[in-house]
UniProtKB/Swiss-Prot annotation:
The gene is argB. It is found in: Cytoplasm. It comes from the Bacteria. PANTHER family: N-ACETYLGLUTAMATE SYNTHASE (PTHR23342), N-ACETYLGLUTAMATE SYNTHASE, MITOCHONDRIAL (PTHR23342:SF0). Keywords: Amino-acid biosynthesis, Arginine biosynthesis, ATP-binding, Cytoplasm, Kinase, Nucleotide-binding, Transferase. InterPro entries: AceGlu_kinase-like_sf, AcgluKinase_fam, ArgB, Asp/Glu/Uridylate_kinase, Glu/AcGlu_kinase, NAGK-C. NCBIfam families: argB. It catalyses: N-acetyl-L-glutamate + ATP = N-acetyl-L-glutamyl 5-phosphate + ADP. Its EC number is 2.7.2.8. Its main location: cytoplasm. GO terms for biological process: arginine biosynthetic process via ornithine; L-arginine biosynthetic process. GO terms for molecular function: acetylglutamate kinase activity; ATP binding. The lineage of its organism: Bacteria, Pseudomonadati, Pseudomonadota, Betaproteobacteria, Burkholderiales. This is Acetylglutamate kinase.
Amino acid sequence: MTQPTVTADDPDLSHVGPRDKAEILAQALPYIRKFHGKTMVIKYGGNAMTDPALQADFAEDVVLLKLVGMNPVVVHGGGPQIEAALNRLGKKGHFIQGMRVTDEETMEVVEWVLAGQVQQDIVGLINQAGGKAVGLTGRDGGLIRAQKLKMVDKDDPAKEHDIGFVGDIVSIDPSVVKALQDDAFIPVISPIGFGESNESYNINADVVAGKLATVLKAEKLVLLTNTPGVLNKAGELLTDLTAREIDDLFADGTISGGMLPKIEGALDAAKSGVNSVHIIDGRVPHAMLLEILTDQAYGTMIRSH
């Protein structure tokens, strides 16, 4: 009998009959067994956060992972929502090497949007889908301690950029995350750290997800983005990248802008022992389940060697 498949190009199950749906579920069983009890850190961002149908799909997928025995941890971004809030205030966003320049007023907006709006929307959707989500920032339980990021110019190492209240992670204490996992909750984390004087720092969500995956000894780090994965200059998907290949892509300018911190966070996690790191297309319905519960080669896998 021909085996039913669901691919990134054809993720819709509406045309699949009951028997084939059962077969698809059976194909997922080995992965459910393999990853039972394992931590999956998911960076949630891009269009998947702004399209209502994709928002609902994401929440359902996270709940499903929890119900079958995995431990999903969500780290979310919120760039479009921050940009919209700043525009309403008449402030124009400015980025250097993929990082948002964050003055004091912008930091207040970032904190309000991420922790007060975006995070609560995600928590509500997961709870509505049958999960038990709890929102956290870096302040909660001393989760993320940070300091001002010193950004060195990628073309001139002698030059530094002052990008304001953008943070560099000093340490992560995962105690509160582990406690929530043990009680069957799903942590939803806003990428805001706190400094020695209790000041807030805006930290790139991809970087937070990578560091958290390392500290939690996660089985997988999955980064949802607005592209099929990492693309070469011809627009072709690169399905597998090593550290050496990534260095070459940095050098020739293939990887730039917002993809820079994403790749850096992914590579850091891979080098630090996270078994599997993937950058996938969050615009595809149920993309996360396709990655975790099927054998489809999907997106870009990042390897340390």
